[in-house]
Amino acid sequence: MALRMLWAGQAKGILGGWGIICLVMSLLLQHPGVYSKCYFQAQAPCHYEGKYFTLGESWLRKDCFHCTCLHPVGVGCCDTSQHPIDFPAGCEVRQEAGTCQFSLVQKSDPRLPCKGGGPDPEWGSANTPVPGAPAPHSS
């Protein structure tokens, strides 16, 4: 119902400019699969690749950002991709061509998926402990 009011242009009087921004940004942040960064561009035009969008309409950019038109105040976008951040040193992240999906592959042979090894407390980019591994001893 609220979106129907937005699309009909009736919400401006009820919610005001900031109310519209808050409503649409809360909807963006609740979008399934959105667990990464979001940003807002004030006064940005609501068009992408030659197509124009109206208030409340959204589109998916080639760089995996889901954007929503907040006309006349701007555009809000959130990254929909989920990038692995903690993985064995012998692996690397690859984006699957033409999609917003990522996978872990072996550095030595990117055609093969990443193999998990035994527990290694030094494992990963964040140097986080492996679940179930013994705690390091302090000296």
Swiss-Prot record:
Residues 1-35 form the signal peptide. GO terms for molecular function: CCR2 chemokine receptor binding; cytokine activity. Residues 108-139 are annotated as: Disordered. The keyword Signal applies. It is found in: Secreted. InterPro entries: PSP94 (IPR008735). Detected in prostate epithelium (at protein level). Detected in trachea and testis. Highly expressed in benign prostatic hyperplasia and in some prostate cancers, and can also be detected in breast tumor tissue. Disulfide bonds join C38-C78, C46-C69, C64-C100, C67-C77, C91-C114. One of its GO terms (cellular component) is cytoplasm. One of its GO terms (biological process) is lymphocyte chemotaxis. It holds the Pfam family PSP94. Keywords: Chemotaxis, Cytokine, Disulfide bond, Inflammatory response, Secreted, Signal. Acts as a ligand for C-C chemokine receptor CCR2. Signals through binding and activation of CCR2 and induces a strong chemotactic response and mobilization of intracellular calcium ions. Exhibits a chemotactic activity for monocytes and lymphocytes but not neutrophils. Belongs to the beta-microseminoprotein family. This is Prostate-associated microseminoprotein. The gene is MSMP.
